[in-house]
């Protein structure tokens, strides 16, 4: 019983101490998505869908929820963001070739159609895409892909 008491106190102290150690935040501003939006020309509705459902994990600007102030949850969130940006980062759009941009949009379509994006862990507190928003997003992504496919054909000539 004595060891359980000491262990509990140690655990509580550890929890308190880690509250003062925070990971770096992903807050570099929405200007980092401007090239992506300039090239893909989303409507205002699609831009809002992207901002509300995609940019938190797939851009250099994250709108953090209140629970990000609690360690170790904030470390878990940062890992999700790093992983999301590793797979699809609209803030790095200018570094992608036309082929890669087409492929990234193809993956976006695939993951949204299969219900894999947005992640369930994200939608628990942020809400999910409505069926209409999903269809609108998919149509926009397909149209955007056509532009990149045209660019690839031009380069092949």
PLM segments and residue spans:
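Soluble non-cytosolic domains of exported or imported proteins
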Residues: 40, 44, 48, 99, ...
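Sequence/structural segment immediately N-terminal to covalent heme-attachment motifs in c-type
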Residues: 42-55, 77
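The canonical Cys-X-X-Cys-His
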Residues: 50-61, 117, 137
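C-terminal capping alpha-helices of c-type cytochrome domains
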Residues: 114-116, 123-152
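Short cysteine/histidine-rich zinc-coordinating motifs and their immediately flanking basic loops
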Residues: 66-72
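Post-cleavage N-terminal segment of exported redox proteins
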Residues: 1-39, 143-157
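Extracytoplasmic electron-transfer domains, predominantly the class I c-type cytochrome c fold
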Residues: 75-123
């Amino acid at each position: 019983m004595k060891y359980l008491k000491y262990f509990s106190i140690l655990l509580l102290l550890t929890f308190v101490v880690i509250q003062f150690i925070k990971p770096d935040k992903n807050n570099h501003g929405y200007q980092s998505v401007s090239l992506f939006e300039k090239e893909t020309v989303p409507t205002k509705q699609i831009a809002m869908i992207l901002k509300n459902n995609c940019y938190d994990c797939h851009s250099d600007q994250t709108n953090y929820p209140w629970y990000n102030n609690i360690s170790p949850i904030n470390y878990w969130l940062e890992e999700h963001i790093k992983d999301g940006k590793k797979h699809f980062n609209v803030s790095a759009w200018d570094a992608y070739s036309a082929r890669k941009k087409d492929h990234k949009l193809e993956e976006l379509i695939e993951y949204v159609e299969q219900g894999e994006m947005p992640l369930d862990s994200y939608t628990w507190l942020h809400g999910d895409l409505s069926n209409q928003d999903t269809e609108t997003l998919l149509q926009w992504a397909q149209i955007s892909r056509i532009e990149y496919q045209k660019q690839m054909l031009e380069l092949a000539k």
